[in-house]
Amino acid sequence: GLFDVIKKVASVIGLASP
């Protein structure tokens, strides 16, 4: 769902930030 997409984006951002 939409929330899953948000969590995925949040995960990518978390991995991208040092």
UniProtKB/Swiss-Prot annotation:
Q: Which InterPro entries match?
A: Aurein_antimicrobial_peptide
**Can the keyword Iron-sulfur be found in this entry's annotation?**
no
Keywords attached to this entry: Amphibian defense peptide, Secreted
Q: Name one GO cellular component term.
A: extracellular region
The record's tissue-specificity note reads:
Expressed by the dorsal and submental skin glands.
What does the record list as GO biological process? defense response
Transmembrane ranges? none
Coiled-coil-forming residues are: none
Compartments it resides in: Secreted
- Superkingdom, taxonomy of origin: Eukaryota
Query: Mainly localized where?
Result: secreted
Protein's name in the database: Citropin-1.1.3
Classification lineage: Eukaryota, Metazoa, Chordata, Craniata, Vertebrata
